[in-house]
């Protein structure tokens, strides 16, 4: 999935928010955004996590996810953002169509394999 060119970011949507940032294929250390505060004193983990998705329903949660991704874009200026995790498939088609350019969706299995690869990269440093 990671092409190795430019800044590539991965976010996973599930019980919370997971992320990884790669520059030219190299994993950037200490790029943990899930514990950042987003709104009403909530972390991104809480704001986009499964509990909120169940509370809001897919329609409203999808809009929230899109707005968060739109907010990340000017901060990270990615060449490509990959969105995965168990809840990525729950983002509605309407909200997917409104996402910024250079956003791709990947199956949940891809995110799990990428997470294992990230641990391997961290362990070898």
Predicted regions and their residues:
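ATP-binding/phosphotransfer module of carbohydrate and carboxylate kinases, centering on a glycine-rich
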Residues: 1-12, 21-125
């Amino acid at each position: 999935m990671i092409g190795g060119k430019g800044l590539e970011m991965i976010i996973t949507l599930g019980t919370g928010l997971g992320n990884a940032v790669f520059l030219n294929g190299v994993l950037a250390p200490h790029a943990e955004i899930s514990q950042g505060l987003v709104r009403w004193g909530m972390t991104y983990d809480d704001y986009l996590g499964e509990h909120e998705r169940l509370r809001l329903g897919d329609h409203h949660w999808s809009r929230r996810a899109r707005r968060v991704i739109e907010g990340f874009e000017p901060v990270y200026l990615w060449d490509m953002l990959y969105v995965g995790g168990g809840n990525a498939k729950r983002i509605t088609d309407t909200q997917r169509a409104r996402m910024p350019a250079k956003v791709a969706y990947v199956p949940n299995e891809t995110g799990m394999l990428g997470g294992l690869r990230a641990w391997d990269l961290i362990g070898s440093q």
